[in-house]
């Protein structure tokens, strides 16, 4: 039995080593000194078209998760501005929403581009593990924002609370509609982020060979 276990472990290690070596040259061929993302700021290199089909699909999924999270934060800011202007909330919530957008965008971009995208494209487990930790926590935060009425976040709990509490019809309609939109975007961001997290988890666990599955799924 010990021999069988040892052989199995050796076989798995050999398979991962070979799989890692095969596509590594293609994925690492990008010019990482060509900083082109985000537009105008140019802090990171992002060129999914330079990757093979499987890694390209993963890269775009990671990017979609980032953009959806940013869109949810923009929705949160706009809803808070409307509610504050209507006199149903304190102006400080606008400041909270703005700083949430700024801070989360910076953390999200760094995590996605420097850790997830670069780690996957160059097959560096350290970067991918960093992405898994940080983006995993951010995904949990997105789930909370989509479900609860936390401080100035308008999740599905806010929708239920507003519908159960009589208020000025005009303001309530705006707040309910805004909360439904914000909650929906948070929910979608959470789902796509979970998919992106799973992709990087598989790439970190199984090596570049795991990315070929996504190429096959796109045919």
For the regions a language model picked out, list residue spans one by one.
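Eukaryotic polytopic
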Residues: 55-82, 89-111, 115-219
């Amino acid at each position: 039995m010990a021999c069988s276990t040892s052989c199995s472990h050796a076989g798995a290690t050999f398979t991962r080593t070979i799989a890692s070596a095969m596509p590594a040259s293609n994925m690492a061929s990008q010019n990482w000194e060509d900083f082109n993302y985000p537009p105008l700021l140019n802090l990171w290199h992002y060129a999914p078209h330079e990757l093979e089909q499987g890694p390209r699909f993963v890269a775009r999924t990671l990017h979609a998760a980032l953009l959806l999270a940013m869109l949810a934060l923009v929705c949160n800011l706009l809803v808070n501005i409307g509610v504050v202007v209507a006199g149903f909330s304190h102006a400080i919530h606008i400041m909270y929403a703005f700083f949430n957008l700024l801070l989360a965008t910076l953390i999200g971009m760094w995590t996605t581009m420097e850790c997830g995208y670069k780690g996957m494209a160059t097959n560096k487990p350290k970067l991918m593990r960093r992405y898994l930790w940080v983006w995993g926590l951010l995904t949990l935060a997105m789930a909370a924002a989509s479900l609860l009425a936390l401080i100035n976040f308008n999740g599905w709990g806010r929708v239920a609370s507003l519908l159960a509490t009589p208020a000025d019809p005009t303001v309530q309609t705006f707040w309910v509609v805004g909360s439904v939109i914000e909650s929906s975007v948070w929910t979608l961001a959470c789902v796509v982020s979970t998919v992106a997290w799973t992709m990087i988890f598989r790439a970190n666990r199984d090596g570049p060979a795991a990315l070929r599955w996504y190429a096959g799924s796109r045919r």
